[in-house]
């Protein structure tokens, strides 16, 4: 019997999810940054800045950015590791990766770039000081396997940062749901000419594990210590996992 998983609120075969997610991000890649600013009111920049500023990344470190998309975090990591460090920008989606690579090149920033599946990372054990994934984990079919891979490629003492939509503060939930399921698809239709992809976005956020569940998943994946910080009343959470 075929194994199933969630694609938003739909139940699909596991083998089909990656293709469906790929279609979403091929469709939205060119408008991704504009839509991020519109959907979050620019807050995504603050969330990412918090991630960068609390990571403790220093010159000479090796950093892997997974599902790095248009390169926001990779740019910030490169500025921090300097010429002696190493930052890899990776994504499973070629359209997103092309946008990110070209954007960084336009800024004069040359980074190694790779199409990579987070569930089968093409990197050796214990190679990176830090691994980051921002707004990408919820789209992965086997999150548990992806987290194990992230732990594998980290050096002992290394750190995983997961920045992801999470469970919002309960009193805000009615307003947040109205915004997510009415406003987001409408913005997607008007700006990106793609309401369906932004309907999936809203649904995928609701299906993603909450803060404590994700913490437990990271511990199960091999991280010795995990903590998290809620941002914007839990709209987003930053989880930090430490490989001991």
UniProtKB/Swiss-Prot annotation:
Pathway info: Quinol/quinone metabolism; menaquinone biosynthesis; menaquinol from 1,4-dihydroxy-2-naphthoate: step 2/2; Cofactor biosynthesis; ubiquinone biosynthesis
Gene Ontology biological process terms in this record: aerobic respiration; menaquinone biosynthetic process; methylation
Gene3D superfamilies documented for this protein: Vaccinia Virus protein VP39
Function field: Methyltransferase required for the conversion of demethylmenaquinol (DMKH2) to menaquinol (MKH2) and the conversion of 2-polyprenyl-6-methoxy-1,4-benzoquinol (DDMQH2) to 2-polyprenyl-3-methyl-6-methoxy-1,4-benzoquinol (DMQH2).
Enzyme Commission identifier(s): 2.1.1.163, 2.1.1.201
Enzyme class of the recorded protein, top EC level: transferase
Protein family: Belongs to the class I-like SAM-binding methyltransferase superfamily. MenG/UbiE family.
InterPro entries: SAM-dependent_MTases_sf, UbiE/COQ5_MeTrFase, UbiE/COQ5_MeTrFase_CS
Listed GO MF terms: 2-methoxy-6-polyprenyl-1,4-benzoquinol methyltransferase activity; demethylmenaquinone methyltransferase activity
Gene name linked to the record: ubiE
SUPFAM superfamilies: S-adenosyl-L-methionine-dependent methyltransferases
Name of this chain's protein: Ubiquinone/menaquinone biosynthesis C-methyltransferase UbiE
Keyword Coiled coil appears in the UniProt entry: no
PROSITE patterns in the cross-refs: SAM_MT_UBIE, UBIE_1, UBIE_2
Reaction equation(s) it catalyzes: a 2-demethylmenaquinol + S-adenosyl-L-methionine = a menaquinol + S-adenosyl-L-homocysteine + H(+); a 2-methoxy-6-(all-trans-polyprenyl)benzene-1,4-diol + S-adenosyl-L-methionine = a 5-methoxy-2-methyl-3-(all-trans-polyprenyl)benzene-1,4-diol + S-adenosyl-L-homocysteine + H(+)
Origin species: Laribacter hongkongensis (strain HLHK9)
Residues that, per the record, bind S-adenosyl-L-methionine: 70, 91, 117-118
Keyword Signal in record: no
Entry keywords, A to Z: Menaquinone biosynthesis, Methyltransferase, S-adenosyl-L-methionine, Transferase, Ubiquinone biosynthesis
One Pfam match: Ubie_methyltran
